[in-house]
């Protein structure tokens, strides 16, 4: 059995939102994605897109934001492991960036 006490669910959500906030504050590409999402929402309101189109937009926003968060996490872990320029570190970072 696991003897460590787990944090309450609300704390887990707090950690998640803290991570998202940090990514938005510190990562240029996340700021670009957020700005693009805002522009798409404005365009969607002006163009009166359908419910299906809103669902598609929201799904894509979520996927892009999630992949950017994963990319940021991969880059942070690689930087934590090594500050040196290594071929495998480059592959890990480039592949994570390519996922976005």
Where would I find each of the regions flagged by the language model?
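Acidic (Asp/Glu-rich) catalytic motifs at the cytosolic membrane interface
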Residues: 63-99
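Hydrophobic, membrane-inserted alpha-helices
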Residues: 18, 36-43
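Short, contiguous pre-domain boundary segments
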Residues: 1-5
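Membrane-embedded alpha-helical segments that form the functional core of polytopic membrane enzymes
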Residues: 40-70
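Alpha-helical transmembrane segments of integral membrane proteins
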Residues: 10, 14, 31-36, 52-59
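Membrane interfacial helix-start motif at the N-side
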Residues: 6, 13-31, 96, 100
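Short helix-capping/hinge motifs at transmembrane helix termini and TM-loop junctions
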Residues: 26, 47-51, 83
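Short, structured helix-loop boundary elements
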Residues: 6, 10, 60, 86-89
């Amino acid at each position: 059995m696991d003897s460590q006490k787990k944090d309450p669910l609300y704390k887990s959500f707090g950690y998640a939102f803290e991570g998202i906030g940090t990514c938005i504050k510190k990562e240029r590409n996340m700021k670009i994605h957020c700005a693009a999402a805002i522009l798409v929402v404005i365009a969607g309101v002006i163009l009166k897109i359908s419910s299906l189109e809103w669902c598609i937009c929201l799904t894509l926003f979520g996927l892009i934001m999630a992949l950017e968060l994963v990319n940021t996490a991969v880059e942070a872990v690689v930087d934590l492991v090594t500050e040196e320029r290594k071929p495998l570190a480059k592959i890990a970072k480039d592949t994570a960036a390519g996922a976005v």
